[in-house]
């Protein structure tokens, strides 16, 4: 079970949002690169970056801190990024800069042809972020709920050749209310590619619950508010996940 610290970037700072609301942000660090080094020192095996301003603008908006993060971690661990990725040029620039995986969210739902092209151009490096509430996919920073069924879209995107899916239960994200294991497992059983859980992870019991379904295809989790506010000790959580995998 791969536990991945999230670094959400807004105006050059590391923040956490509640329910995806840009106006409800808690600043956790003025120095995102130092935060990246902190998670690396604690044994993180991958980092998850989100350009929140970019997600709104539809193009990269936190390039300086992203570059600083990549310099801080070097080649030690892979870094994945999402937020505002709408064209192949942006993907290419990120990969050339040292990003390992690019996450496509809203653009994958609105423009499946773009996702298909991206998977073809950059095989093994495209992850899809699917945000859902009650089984329906949301787009545009969660502001719009579509009629798309999350399971149907996941299968379609797998067929396009995406590397993995990050599934966020948007009713729980940033709320520390517990991960939606059932919905995550349903999705993981529906596809053959890895699924990463996101949203609501509050403590060690959530990690243990996800470890119990790792064989169903839930291969990791994105950790946010819980590790920033101290509800979850990252090092202890990864150690426990490794122990349960034996």
From Swiss-Prot:
Main localization, broad class: cytoplasm
Alphabetical list of Gene3D superfamilies matching this protein: Aldolase class I
Keywords for the protein's UniProt record, in alphabetical order: Amino-acid biosynthesis, Cytoplasm, Histidine biosynthesis, Isomerase
Annotated localization: Cytoplasm
Reactions the enzyme catalyzes: 1-(5-phospho-beta-D-ribosyl)-5-[(5-phospho-beta-D-ribosylamino)methylideneamino]imidazole-4-carboxamide = 5-[(5-phospho-1-deoxy-D-ribulos-1-ylimino)methylamino]-1-(5-phospho-beta-D-ribosyl)imidazole-4-carboxamide
Gene Ontology biological-process entries: L-histidine biosynthetic process; L-tryptophan biosynthetic process
Range of residues in the leader sequence: none
SUPFAM superfamilies noted in UniProt: Ribulose-phoshate binding barrel
Taxonomic classification: Bacteria, Pseudomonadati, Pseudomonadota, Betaproteobacteria, Burkholderiales
Gene Ontology MF terms in the entry: 1-(5-phosphoribosyl)-5-[(5-phosphoribosylamino)methylideneamino]imidazole-4-carboxamide isomerase activity
Name the UniProt record assigns to this protein: 1-(5-phosphoribosyl)-5-[(5-phosphoribosylamino)methylideneamino] imidazole-4-carboxamide isomerase
Keyword Amino-acid biosynthesis appears in the UniProt entry: yes
Pathway entry: Amino-acid biosynthesis; L-histidine biosynthesis; L-histidine from 5-phospho-alpha-D-ribose 1-diphosphate: step 4/9
Active site: 8 (proton acceptor), 131 (proton donor)
Family recorded in the similarity comment: Belongs to the HisA/HisF family.
């Amino acid at each position: 079970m791969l536990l991945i610290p999230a670094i959400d970037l807004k105006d050059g700072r590391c923040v956490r949002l509640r329910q995806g609301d840009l106006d409800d942000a808690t600043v956790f660090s003025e120095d995102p690169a130092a935060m990246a080094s902190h998670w690396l020192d604690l044994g993180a095996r991958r980092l998850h970056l989100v350009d929140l301003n970019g997600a709104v603008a539809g193009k990269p908006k936190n390039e300086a801190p992203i570059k600083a993060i990549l310099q801080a971690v070097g080649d030690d661990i892979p870094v994945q990024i999402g937020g505002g990725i709408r064209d192949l040029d942006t993907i290419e620039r990120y990969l050339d800069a040292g990003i390992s995986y690019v996450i496509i969210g809203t653009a994958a739902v609105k423009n499946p042809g773009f996702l298909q092209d991206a998977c073809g151009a950059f095989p093994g490096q495209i992850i899809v972020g699917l945000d859902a509430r009650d089984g329906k996919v949301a787009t545009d920073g969660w502001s719009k709920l579509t009629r798309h069924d999350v399971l149907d879209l996941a299968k379609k995107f797998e067929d396009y050749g995406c590397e993995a899916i990050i599934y966020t239960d948007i009713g729980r994200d940033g709320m520390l209310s517990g991960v939606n294991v059932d919905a995550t497992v349903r999705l993981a059983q529906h596809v053959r590619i890895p699924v990463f859980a996101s949203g609501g992870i509050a403590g060690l019991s959530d990690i243990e619950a996800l470890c119990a379904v790792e064989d169903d295809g839930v291969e990791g989790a994105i950790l946010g508010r819980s590790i920033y506010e101290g509800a979850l000790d990252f090092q202890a959580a990864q150690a426990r996940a490794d122990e349960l995998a034996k």
